[in-house]
A protein has these predicted regions:
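Solvent-exposed loop/turn segments flanking beta-strands in beta-repeat/beta-sandwich domains
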Residues: 1-10, 108-122, 207-219, 296
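Short, surface-exposed loop motifs enriched in S/T, G, D/E and P with embedded aromatic residues
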Residues: 12-21, 32, 127-133, 222-228
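Aromatic sugar-binding surface patches on proteins
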Residues: 21-34, 136-144, 228-232
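Surface-exposed, short loops/turns at beta-strand junctions within beta-sandwich domains
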Residues: 32-44, 147-154, 235-242
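Flexible, low-complexity linkers/stalks enriched in Thr/Pro that connect modular domains
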Residues: 65-85, 173-183, 261-270
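Short, solvent-exposed loop/linker segments at the N-terminal edge
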Residues: 92-98, 192-199, 280-286
């Protein structure tokens, strides 16, 4: 009897093998699965081969066969690298916390993330202390809190990771600025406790912030234009009596500095209530007293 057919059952499909007279072997070209084999038993796909002769007798071997089973196990590697994403801080952020909790997520929906390959670098220096890796669907959510406060200024964090099939994601970076110091704010006008009879008053001053320029300024809640050198001025209208002027400078990180001034507007002229000369009349060369009662 002769072999009639040879079939290969793999990944739910059956493939007919063709006899190659030059080698004396049966062969077929089979497409690899679209998913990697990492989630399979032993991280490999199994299969079976069925040989049938002209009489209808058949022999089947599969991955459990003692002789050829290992040869029927196929490892399939994925080609897609993991996805990396920062959740905090965001790119270009200005933050006031010098020890921010840096959070990011690494995912791979095929062979999976190899947690040993997750790397985080702060300003180019690899983090060697432990950081949190929490397993989630398709990957890990990670967080790291610097053990030492970051200096005020710009910082860059980068992350790296690979999947179990060795695909390495391109490093992902995020740059942000730490600002723990509020802006400077000085008022050149008005002086505190000023008393004036003018209803129009110019509020002027200067502000600056080394880390988080530009600084915005409000006078009694109204926005004021700040010049490139940090100077500003705004004319306001006083009400009769006591006026409180509140000037607030805010930097890009949200830090604020507030200066207040008390100004009194008095538009009423003094009123004379009484004027007397004593004695009156007075002798030549003598002295007399003038007495005035006046209110305001």
């Amino acid at each position: 009897m002769a072999v009639k057919t040879v079939q290969y059952v793999f990944n739910g499909q059956t493939y007919d093998l063709t006899f190659d007279a030059s080698t004396g072997e049966y062969k077929a070209t089979v497409p690899a699965p679209s998913k990697s084999s990492y989630s399979q038993d032993g991280h490999k796909y199994g299969g079976s081969v069925i040989a049938t002769d002209d009489a209808g007798n058949s022999t089947t071997i599969n991955q459990s066969d003692a002789t050829f089973g290992a040869n029927l196990l196929l490892r399939v590697l994925e080609k897609v690298a993991p996805t990396l994403a920062f959740t905090y801080p965001t790119a270009g952020a200005y933050i006031t916390n010098a020890t921010p909790v840096i959070k990011f997520k690494v995912t791979d929906n095929d062979s999976g993330i190899n947690p040993d390959t997750i790397v985080i670098k702060v300003d180019g220096a690899k983090v060697t202390t432990a950081f949190t890796k929490t397993e989630v669907t398709d990957g890990y959510e990670c967080s790291y809190t610097p053990g030492t406060a970051l200096a005020d200024g710009a910082h860059t964090v980068s992350i790296e990771a690979s999947d179990y099939d060795g695909n390495a994601a391109s490093a992902k970076t995020v740059s942000f600025t730490v600002d723990t110091i509020p802006p400077t704010l000085t008022l050149t006008n008005p002086a505190d406790e000023l008393i004036t009879n003018k209803t129009a008053l110019v509020v002027s001053g200067k502000t600056d912030d080394v880390t988080s320029k530009p600084v915005t300024v409000t006078v009694n809640g109204a926005s004021v234009t700040v010049n490139s050198d940090g100077s500003f001025s705004k004319e306001i209208t006083l009400v009769n009596g006591s006026n409180t002027i509140t000037v607030v400078a805010t930097d890009k990180a949200g830090k604020t500095t507030t200066v207040t001034r008390k100004v009194t507007l008095d538009t009423g002229a003094p009123v004379f209530e009484k004027v007397t000369l004593t004695p009156n009349p007075v002798g030549c060369g003598k002295t007399f007293i003038i007495s005035v009662k006046v209110t305001d």
